[in-house]
């Protein structure tokens, strides 16, 4: 691809041959006059004698008489040992130089050097601009060489995202072909196949920002859950999560990650269209039929569930009897230690705090009733989530609902030519009702004239389905 030797730079330097036991003292005297370059040791082995070492002098020392070094320091050195000045060469090769330095040498003048890339486990996603595509293989080789073994696969996006699952097409430019990897975020671990599911490492802080708004015992509905970057942290806080995604591969990895992070008893996984998903949660008769086996088994029984130990046998029977792609992983369990108030809304108790301590906790096994209360709804599909706000119109039945209506967290893109008022108008058009006290949070810039925002608001009571 290219000759690595062409990047070699040979430095002609001077060095002092010093007895090995005196090198430490000599280096103190020569402070400021020794070679000071990243990853190059100024004291090295002497190839001619095991009892001595070579103290490499800086490039500023040009002459063998060491005239650039103050006489006072030279006199101190002479008291330590007889001065023996020898020529020494240092070759800075391909392995020494940074990726940025090498690419500046390789790429034509005027092209922007790719200074960063997204890291997904062992995978580096370059996302090269069109003008860099003719040099994609060279760029990939340099980045691979300079980041291995932390990075084992280099990929680049091919074309635009056009499929319904928001998953780009990639080509592997260097390294292994394996696209399955593992990502860590704030105490959670996620397994995924980067070629099959959507993942954006740059949203890590947003995942935790939103999760920090949730309280233990709350119920969260994640309409575009992916592999669980919002659902898993929410469950780790002791929330009960209804998580949905249209992509079957995302759902498969969501289930894997729920179990991997030991929160599968707090996440109910669905694989369906987002509108149908929310309608399904609000359909009283359908949910009652699905959960009848739980009700018949024991409506109020408490089971002590150990994090890594045995589970109650009846709980296992419930888990098996309700297992399907549109059923909860954990047999429709409600949040750990949740108690009911007079209005039926779940409140915190100490057993939920125990969930975070990863020890023993108490888990209630009553019928889950999402049509009665949900605290938060997450809509992380910024390209089209606003259009899905019609999912909430005339679906929640007023006669069954208890407590405040949910907070909606809807992600969207706002271009430089657009205003928040324009986005509110678009949201109200889809919702068909006025939104009170909307809050915008800027997540990140995605392009020079385009930013990602989170619009949060309380669902208007006008959206409720009135009693007939």
Swiss-Prot record:
According to UniProt, the name of this protein is tRNA (guanine(37)-N(1))-methyltransferase 1
- Give the PROSITE patterns listed for this entry: SAM_MT_TRM5_TYW2 (PS51684)
**Function statement:** Specifically methylates the N1 position of guanosine-37 in various cytoplasmic and mitochondrial tRNAs. Methylation is not dependent on the nature of the nucleoside 5' of the target nucleoside. This is the first step in the biosynthesis of wybutosine (yW), a modified base adjacent to the anticodon of tRNAs and required for accurate decoding.
Q: Which GO terms describe its molecular function?
A: tRNA (guanine(37)-N1)-methyltransferase activity
> Cross-referenced SUPFAM superfamilies, in alphabetical order?
S-adenosyl-L-methionine-dependent methyltransferases
Q: Where is this chain primarily localised?
A: mitochondrion
- Detail which positions bind S-adenosyl-L-methionine: 207, 245-246, 273-274, 380
UniProt organism field: Arabidopsis thaliana
Q: What biological processes does GO assign it? A: tRNA N1-guanine methylation
Catalyses: guanosine(37) in tRNA + S-adenosyl-L-methionine = N(1)-methylguanosine(37) in tRNA + S-adenosyl-L-homocysteine + H(+)
Top enzyme category: transferase
Q: Which UniProt keywords apply?
A: Cytoplasm, Methyltransferase, Mitochondrion, Nucleus, S-adenosyl-L-methionine, Transferase, tRNA processing
Q: What's one GO-annotated cellular component?
A: mitochondrial matrix
Which top-rank group of organisms is this from? Eukaryota
Q: What is the similarity comment for this entry?
A: Belongs to the class I-like SAM-binding methyltransferase superfamily. TRM5/TYW2 family.
Give the E.C. number(s): 2.1.1.228
Compartment(s): Mitochondrion matrix; Nucleus; Cytoplasm
Q: By its UniProt entry, which InterPro entries does this protein fall under?
A: MeTrfase_TRM5/TYW2 (IPR030382), SAM-dependent_MTases_sf (IPR029063), TRM5-TYW2-like_MTfase (IPR056743), TRM5/TYW2-like_N (IPR056744), tRNA_Gua_MeTrfase_euk (IPR025792)
Name the segments for region: Disordered.
301-348
